[in-house]
């Protein structure tokens, strides 16, 4: 089984993207052939040990919104890749225990947001602009669940088809012009609302979402992480985590 893992790790997210790859391979106990598709403004080659299959594509962005909106177009560039499955994870996702692909593999998969049964239990954070392609009305008759923008995936064929529509919707909204409050996540939720995926319930989600290791607080994306990059480059064979803004082994 050829599984492609897609990461977008520009600017300060680079360090976290390297963390994800190393910890993924360290804790992975499955049988799949794993390829990482690493979209970044920094080549990861000198930061990773030999034996990890990581394919680098240069991308850059000026704002966080531009960065998060790179997801669909980046995945579309993988149309001719050899991976039979493609799964996107946010670069600031962390892994702390052994796992296999069984918890996330599927034909088209979405993750139940951890807030779905918390602050969003009564009212989901859907986009409510009726002019937007991400629009879901308050009085929708369909069952409601709020999904992560930080994780989604499936077969390559399904992912390419999905991302083609998501990218079309993004570009169509730019003509208004309009940017949904939760960006790509709003489009993902609109699609899954009408086309329910195989769901990973939040209680079964085996990774930690949005763990930035306290690298800065505001304006995180543009934090200077040169010292962290130098440290992990010099110890590229070591598994590490980021805690309180520092590298820990």
Q: What are the residue ranges of the model-derived segments?
A:
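Active-site regions of enzymes building and remodeling cell-envelope glycoconjugates
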Residues: 49-62, 103-111, 215-219
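Short, polar loop motifs at secondary-structure junctions
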Residues: 38-46, 91-98, 204-206
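Catalytic core and acceptor-binding pocket of nucleotide-sugar-dependent glycosyltransferases
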Residues: 138-233, 242-243
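GT-A fold catalytic core of metal-dependent nucleotide-sugar glycosyltransferases
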Residues: 72-120
């Amino acid at each position: 089984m050829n599984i492609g893992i897609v990461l977008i790790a520009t600017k300060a997210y680079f360090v976290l993207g390297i963390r994800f790859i190393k910890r993924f391979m360290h804790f992975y106990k499955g049988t799949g052939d794993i390829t990482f598709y690493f979209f970044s403004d920094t080549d990861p080659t000198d930061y990773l040990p030999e034996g990890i299959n990581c394919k680098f594509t240069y991308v850059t962005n000026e704002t966080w919104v531009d960065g998060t909106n790179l997801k669909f177009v980046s995945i579309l560039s993988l149309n001719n890749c050899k991976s039979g499955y493609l799964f996107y994870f946010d670069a600031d996702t962390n892994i702390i225990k052994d796992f296999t692909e069984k918890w996330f593999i599927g034909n088209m998969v979405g993750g139940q947001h951890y807030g779905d049964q918390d602050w969003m239990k009564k009212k989901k954070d859907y986009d409510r602009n009726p002019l937007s392609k991400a629009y879901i009305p308050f009085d929708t008759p369909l069952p409601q669940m709020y999904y992560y923008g930080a994780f989604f995936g499936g077969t390559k064929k399904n992912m390419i088809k999905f991302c083609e529509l998501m990218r079309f919707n993004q570009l169509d909204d730019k003509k208004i012009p309009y940017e949904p409050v939760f960006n790509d996540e709003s489009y993902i939720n609109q699609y899954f609302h009408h086309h329910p995926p195989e769901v990973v319930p939040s209680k079964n989600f085996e990774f930690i979402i949005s763990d930035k290791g306290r690298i800065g607080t505001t304006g995180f994306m543009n934090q200077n992480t040169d010292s962290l990059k130098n440290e992990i480059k010099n110890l590229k064979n070591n598994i590490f985590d980021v805690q309180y803004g520092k590298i820990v082994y």
